[in-house]
Protein backbone atom coordinates (compact mmCIF):
# COMPACT_ATOMS: atom_id res chain seq x y z
CA UNK A 1 0.00 0.00 0.00
CA UNK A 2 1.18 3.55 -0.75
CA UNK A 3 0.91 6.29 1.88
CA UNK A 4 -1.87 5.49 4.33
CA UNK A 5 -4.54 8.12 4.98
CA UNK A 6 -5.76 8.25 8.59
CA UNK A 7 -9.21 9.79 9.02
CA UNK A 8 -10.60 10.87 12.41
CA UNK A 9 -14.29 11.66 12.13
CA UNK A 10 -17.38 12.38 14.18
CA UNK A 11 -20.82 13.93 14.07
CA UNK A 12 -23.42 14.49 16.73
CA UNK A 13 -26.78 13.84 15.11
CA UNK A 14 -29.97 12.01 16.01
CA UNK A 15 -29.58 8.50 14.57
CA UNK A 16 -32.64 6.47 15.56
CA UNK A 17 -31.67 3.85 12.95
CA UNK A 18 -28.02 3.55 14.03
CA UNK A 19 -28.24 -0.21 14.59
CA UNK A 20 -29.30 -0.83 10.98
CA UNK A 21 -26.21 1.03 9.71
CA UNK A 22 -23.71 -1.28 11.42
CA UNK A 23 -23.62 -4.24 9.03
CA UNK A 24 -23.62 -2.35 5.69
CA UNK A 25 -21.00 0.08 7.04
CA UNK A 26 -18.76 -2.77 8.17
CA UNK A 27 -19.18 -4.51 4.81
CA UNK A 28 -18.22 -1.33 2.95
CA UNK A 29 -15.11 -0.82 5.10
CA UNK A 30 -13.97 -4.42 4.72
CA UNK A 31 -14.46 -4.43 0.95
CA UNK A 32 -12.42 -1.21 0.66
CA UNK A 33 -9.57 -2.48 2.84
CA UNK A 34 -10.26 0.14 5.51
CA UNK A 35 -9.13 -0.65 9.06
CA UNK A 36 -9.92 1.02 12.35
CA UNK A 37 -12.99 1.44 14.53
CA UNK A 38 -16.19 3.44 14.15
CA UNK A 39 -18.74 3.86 16.95
CA UNK A 40 -22.45 4.24 16.27
CA UNK A 41 -25.02 5.43 18.80
CA UNK A 42 -28.35 7.19 18.83
CA UNK A 43 -26.41 10.44 19.30
CA UNK A 44 -24.16 10.04 16.22
CA UNK A 45 -20.93 8.55 14.89
CA UNK A 46 -17.29 8.73 16.02
CA UNK A 47 -14.01 6.97 15.28
CA UNK A 48 -10.72 6.79 13.43
CA UNK A 49 -10.05 4.67 10.36
CA UNK A 50 -7.28 4.30 7.81
CA UNK A 51 -6.87 3.21 4.21
CA UNK A 52 -5.94 4.50 0.78
CA UNK A 53 -6.97 8.00 -0.23
CA UNK A 54 -9.54 6.56 -2.62
CA UNK A 55 -10.95 4.25 0.06
CA UNK A 56 -11.32 7.07 2.59
CA UNK A 57 -12.90 9.38 0.00
CA UNK A 58 -15.38 6.65 -0.93
CA UNK A 59 -16.18 5.99 2.74
CA UNK A 60 -17.00 9.66 3.36
CA UNK A 61 -19.18 9.65 0.24
CA UNK A 62 -20.94 6.47 1.42
CA UNK A 63 -21.60 7.99 4.83
CA UNK A 64 -22.92 11.20 3.25
CA UNK A 65 -25.65 9.15 1.56
CA UNK A 66 -26.94 7.88 4.91
CA UNK A 67 -29.65 9.92 6.64
CA UNK A 68 -28.01 12.49 8.92
CA UNK A 69 -24.40 11.57 8.14
CA UNK A 70 -23.61 14.23 5.56
CA UNK A 71 -21.08 16.97 6.39
CA UNK A 72 -19.23 14.81 8.93
CA UNK A 73 -16.41 16.58 10.78
CA UNK A 74 -13.19 14.87 9.74
CA UNK A 75 -9.43 15.38 9.90
CA UNK A 76 -6.88 13.65 7.70
CA UNK A 77 -3.29 12.75 8.53
CA UNK A 78 -0.83 10.31 7.01
CA UNK A 79 1.38 7.38 7.89
CA UNK A 80 3.76 5.09 6.04
CA UNK A 81 2.18 1.97 7.50
CA UNK A 82 -1.32 0.90 8.48
CA UNK A 83 -1.85 2.03 12.11
CA UNK A 84 -4.69 -0.42 12.82
CA UNK A 85 -4.95 -4.22 12.77
CA UNK A 86 -8.70 -4.74 12.55
CA UNK A 87 -11.93 -3.37 11.11
CA UNK A 88 -14.76 -2.75 13.59
CA UNK A 89 -18.12 -0.99 13.76
CA UNK A 90 -19.44 -0.98 17.33
CA UNK A 91 -22.85 -0.07 18.73
CA UNK A 92 -22.65 2.13 21.84
CA UNK A 93 -24.81 4.10 24.25
CA UNK A 94 -22.63 7.19 23.66
CA UNK A 95 -20.08 8.00 20.96
CA UNK A 96 -17.91 9.65 23.61
CA UNK A 97 -18.43 8.65 27.22
CA UNK A 98 -18.75 11.39 29.81
CA UNK A 99 -21.09 9.55 32.14
CA UNK A 100 -23.51 12.44 32.67
CA UNK A 101 -27.12 11.94 31.63
CA UNK A 102 -28.89 14.59 29.58
CA UNK A 103 -25.87 16.32 28.04
CA UNK A 104 -26.85 16.96 24.43
CA UNK A 105 -24.48 18.96 22.16
CA UNK A 106 -27.33 19.17 19.64
CA UNK A 107 -29.23 21.43 22.06
CA UNK A 108 -26.49 23.50 23.68
CA UNK A 109 -22.76 23.75 23.05
CA UNK A 110 -19.89 26.20 23.43
CA UNK A 111 -18.80 28.72 20.81
CA UNK A 112 -16.67 27.21 18.05
CA UNK A 113 -13.36 28.96 17.41
CA UNK A 114 -11.51 28.47 14.13
CA UNK A 115 -7.84 27.42 14.37
CA UNK A 116 -6.78 30.73 12.78
CA UNK A 117 -8.50 32.65 15.62
CA UNK A 118 -7.45 30.35 18.47
CA UNK A 119 -4.13 32.06 19.32
CA UNK A 120 -5.83 35.41 19.82
CA UNK A 121 -8.45 33.89 22.12
CA UNK A 122 -6.09 31.95 24.38
CA UNK A 123 -3.68 34.90 24.60
CA UNK A 124 -6.39 36.87 26.39
CA UNK A 125 -5.39 36.95 30.10
CA UNK A 126 -9.06 36.75 31.09
CA UNK A 127 -9.49 33.39 29.35
CA UNK A 128 -8.95 30.18 31.34
CA UNK A 129 -7.57 27.55 28.95
CA UNK A 130 -8.42 23.96 29.93
CA UNK A 131 -7.09 20.77 28.34
CA UNK A 132 -9.96 18.24 28.41
CA UNK A 133 -7.75 15.27 27.54
CA UNK A 134 -6.33 12.60 29.85
CA UNK A 135 -3.14 13.01 31.85
CA UNK A 136 -1.06 10.67 29.69
CA UNK A 137 -2.06 12.69 26.61
CA UNK A 138 -1.21 16.03 28.22
CA UNK A 139 2.22 14.76 29.26
CA UNK A 140 3.56 14.67 25.71
CA UNK A 141 2.07 17.92 24.43
CA UNK A 142 -0.41 20.72 25.13
CA UNK A 143 -1.01 24.42 24.50
CA UNK A 144 1.11 27.00 26.27
CA UNK A 145 -0.37 27.94 29.67
CA UNK A 146 -3.14 25.34 29.47
CA UNK A 147 -4.55 23.94 32.73
CA UNK A 148 -4.16 20.17 33.12
CA UNK A 149 -7.14 18.67 35.03
CA UNK A 150 -5.08 15.51 35.68
CA UNK A 151 -7.91 13.18 34.72
CA UNK A 152 -7.36 9.52 33.90
CA UNK A 153 -10.57 9.25 31.86
CA UNK A 154 -13.09 11.67 30.39
CA UNK A 155 -15.61 10.43 32.97
CA UNK A 156 -13.60 12.31 35.62
CA UNK A 157 -13.95 15.67 33.88
CA UNK A 158 -17.34 16.64 35.41
CA UNK A 159 -15.89 16.12 38.90
CA UNK A 160 -12.94 18.35 38.00
CA UNK A 161 -15.34 21.08 36.87
CA UNK A 162 -17.36 20.90 40.08
CA UNK A 163 -14.26 21.00 42.28
CA UNK A 164 -12.12 23.56 40.46
CA UNK A 165 -14.22 25.78 38.19
CA UNK A 166 -16.71 28.47 39.22
CA UNK A 167 -19.05 30.35 36.85
CA UNK A 168 -18.79 33.44 39.06
CA UNK A 169 -14.98 33.42 38.94
CA UNK A 170 -14.18 31.95 35.54
CA UNK A 171 -16.06 34.21 33.15
CA UNK A 172 -14.35 32.96 29.99
CA UNK A 173 -13.34 29.32 29.54
CA UNK A 174 -11.70 27.88 26.43
CA UNK A 175 -11.24 24.13 25.97
CA UNK A 176 -9.63 21.80 23.48
CA UNK A 177 -9.15 18.10 22.76
CA UNK A 178 -7.61 15.92 20.05
CA UNK A 179 -10.27 16.09 17.36
CA UNK A 180 -13.02 18.20 18.88
CA UNK A 181 -15.53 15.59 19.98
CA UNK A 182 -14.82 15.62 23.72
CA UNK A 183 -15.19 19.39 23.70
CA UNK A 184 -18.65 19.06 22.20
CA UNK A 185 -19.74 17.43 25.45
CA UNK A 186 -17.46 19.30 27.86
CA UNK A 187 -18.62 22.71 26.62
CA UNK A 188 -22.24 21.54 26.65
CA UNK A 189 -21.71 20.42 30.25
CA UNK A 190 -20.21 23.78 31.29
CA UNK A 191 -23.10 25.64 29.68
CA UNK A 192 -25.51 23.43 31.63
CA UNK A 193 -23.59 24.30 34.82
CA UNK A 194 -24.13 28.03 34.29
CA UNK A 195 -20.88 29.09 32.62
CA UNK A 196 -21.61 31.89 30.18
CA UNK A 197 -18.69 32.34 27.78
CA UNK A 198 -17.47 28.88 26.84
CA UNK A 199 -15.31 28.31 23.77
CA UNK A 200 -13.73 25.32 22.10
CA UNK A 201 -11.24 24.73 19.32
CA UNK A 202 -13.14 23.69 16.21
CA UNK A 203 -11.65 20.50 14.79
CA UNK A 204 -9.43 20.04 17.83
CA UNK A 205 -5.66 19.98 18.05
CA UNK A 206 -5.33 18.00 14.82
CA UNK A 207 -7.08 20.72 12.82
CA UNK A 208 -4.98 23.39 14.52
CA UNK A 209 -1.74 21.61 13.61
CA UNK A 210 -2.98 21.25 10.05
CA UNK A 211 -3.92 24.91 9.55
CA UNK A 212 -1.58 26.95 11.77
CA UNK A 213 2.04 27.42 10.71
CA UNK A 214 4.55 25.97 13.14
CA UNK A 215 6.35 29.29 13.57
CA UNK A 216 3.05 30.86 14.69
CA UNK A 217 1.91 27.92 16.78
CA UNK A 218 1.29 28.01 20.54
CA UNK A 219 1.25 24.21 20.68
CA UNK A 220 4.14 22.68 22.64
CA UNK A 221 5.23 19.07 22.10
CA UNK A 222 3.41 16.35 20.18
CA UNK A 223 -0.23 15.29 20.02
CA UNK A 224 -1.25 11.86 21.33
CA UNK A 225 -3.41 9.84 18.94
CA UNK A 226 -5.29 6.61 19.59
CA UNK A 227 -3.61 4.36 17.07
CA UNK A 228 -0.25 2.69 16.49
CA UNK A 229 1.44 6.00 15.66
CA UNK A 230 1.07 6.95 19.35
CA UNK A 231 1.69 10.64 18.62
CA UNK A 232 2.00 13.06 15.70
CA UNK A 233 4.22 16.11 15.37
CA UNK A 234 3.26 19.54 14.07
CA UNK A 235 3.45 18.26 10.49
CA UNK A 236 0.94 15.53 11.43
CA UNK A 237 3.60 12.89 10.86
CA UNK A 238 4.40 10.06 13.29
CA UNK A 239 6.21 11.54 16.27
CA UNK A 240 9.07 10.39 18.47
CA UNK A 241 7.02 8.43 21.01
CA UNK A 242 6.49 4.70 21.19
CA UNK A 243 3.96 2.93 23.40
CA UNK A 244 4.42 0.36 26.12
CA UNK A 245 2.45 -2.74 25.13
CA UNK A 246 1.92 -3.59 28.79
CA UNK A 247 0.34 -0.36 30.09
CA UNK A 248 -0.21 1.64 26.85
CA UNK A 249 1.58 4.71 28.21
CA UNK A 250 3.60 6.75 25.67
CA UNK A 251 7.34 6.29 26.17
CA UNK A 252 10.46 8.06 24.88
CA UNK A 253 13.65 6.55 23.51
CA UNK A 254 15.32 7.46 26.81
CA UNK A 255 12.70 5.49 28.73
CA UNK A 256 13.16 2.57 26.35
CA UNK A 257 16.86 2.60 27.27
CA UNK A 258 15.93 2.14 30.94
CA UNK A 259 16.48 -1.18 32.70
CA UNK A 260 12.76 -1.10 33.49
CA UNK A 261 11.86 -1.37 29.82
CA UNK A 262 11.35 -4.84 28.40
CA UNK A 263 9.73 -4.91 24.97
CA UNK A 264 6.07 -5.85 25.33
CA UNK A 265 6.43 -6.56 29.06
CA UNK A 266 7.15 -3.42 31.09
CA UNK A 267 8.36 0.18 31.11
CA UNK A 268 9.36 2.73 33.80
CA UNK A 269 5.68 3.68 34.20
CA UNK A 270 4.34 0.21 34.97
CA UNK A 271 7.20 -2.06 36.08
CA UNK A 272 6.18 -1.75 39.75
CA UNK A 273 2.54 -2.55 38.95
CA UNK A 274 2.94 -5.84 37.08
CA UNK A 275 2.42 -9.14 38.85
CA UNK A 276 4.56 -12.18 38.06
CA UNK A 277 1.56 -13.82 36.40
CA UNK A 278 1.04 -10.79 34.18
CA UNK A 279 4.74 -10.65 33.35
CA UNK A 280 4.70 -14.25 32.17
CA UNK A 281 1.60 -13.61 30.09
CA UNK A 282 3.13 -10.50 28.50
CA UNK A 283 6.36 -12.36 27.76
CA UNK A 284 4.42 -15.11 25.99
CA UNK A 285 2.39 -12.56 24.03
CA UNK A 286 5.57 -10.80 22.92
CA UNK A 287 7.12 -14.11 21.89
CA UNK A 288 4.07 -14.91 19.76
CA UNK A 289 4.19 -11.45 18.20
CA UNK A 290 7.85 -11.87 17.31
CA UNK A 291 7.14 -15.26 15.72
CA UNK A 292 4.24 -13.77 13.76
CA UNK A 293 6.47 -10.93 12.58
CA UNK A 294 9.04 -13.41 11.27
CA UNK A 295 6.27 -15.13 9.32
CA UNK A 296 5.10 -11.80 7.96
CA UNK A 297 1.82 -11.96 9.85
CA UNK A 298 0.07 -9.60 12.24
CA UNK A 299 -0.41 -11.32 15.57
CA UNK A 300 -3.86 -10.43 16.91
CA UNK A 301 -4.32 -13.43 19.11
CA UNK A 302 -6.11 -16.68 18.35
CA UNK A 303 -7.11 -17.35 21.95
CA UNK A 304 -10.08 -15.07 22.64
CA UNK A 305 -9.79 -15.57 26.38
CA UNK A 306 -6.14 -14.54 26.32
CA UNK A 307 -6.95 -11.45 24.27
CA UNK A 308 -9.67 -10.37 26.71
CA UNK A 309 -7.38 -10.93 29.70
CA UNK A 310 -4.60 -8.99 27.98
CA UNK A 311 -6.91 -6.03 27.46
CA UNK A 312 -7.93 -6.12 31.12
CA UNK A 313 -4.28 -6.18 32.14
CA UNK A 314 -3.51 -3.25 29.85
CA UNK A 315 -6.33 -1.15 31.30
CA UNK A 316 -5.37 -2.02 34.87
CA UNK A 317 -1.71 -1.18 34.31
CA UNK A 318 -2.56 2.04 32.49
CA UNK A 319 -4.69 3.15 35.43
CA UNK A 320 -1.91 2.34 37.91
CA UNK A 321 0.69 4.12 35.78
CA UNK A 322 -1.49 7.23 35.53
CA UNK A 323 -2.02 7.29 39.29
CA UNK A 324 1.73 6.90 39.79
CA UNK A 325 2.37 9.74 37.34
CA UNK A 326 -0.15 12.02 39.05
CA UNK A 327 1.25 11.29 42.51
CA UNK A 328 4.75 12.01 41.27
CA UNK A 329 3.66 15.42 39.98
CA UNK A 330 1.69 16.26 43.12
CA UNK A 331 4.67 15.45 45.34
CA UNK A 332 7.05 17.82 43.62
Curated annotation (Swiss-Prot):
The active site is at 177 (cysteine persulfide intermediate). Residues 302-332 are annotated as: Disordered. Coiled coil: none annotated. Pfam families: Rhodanese, UPF0176_N. Signal peptide: none annotated. Keywords: Oxidoreductase, tRNA processing. GO terms for molecular function: oxidoreductase activity, acting on paired donors, with incorporation or reduction of molecular oxygen. One of its GO terms (biological process) is tRNA modification. Residues 123-217 form the Rhodanese domain. CDD domains: RHOD_YceA. Its EC number is 1.14.-.-. SMART domains: RHOD. It catalyses: uridine(34) in tRNA + AH2 + O2 = 5-hydroxyuridine(34) in tRNA + A + H2O. It is an enzyme of class 1 (oxidoreductase). Disulfide bonds: none annotated. Belongs to the TrhO family. Catalyzes oxygen-dependent 5-hydroxyuridine (ho5U) modification at position 34 in tRNAs. This is tRNA uridine(34) hydroxylase. The lineage of its organism: Bacteria, Pseudomonadati, Pseudomonadota, Gammaproteobacteria, Alteromonadales. The gene is trhO.
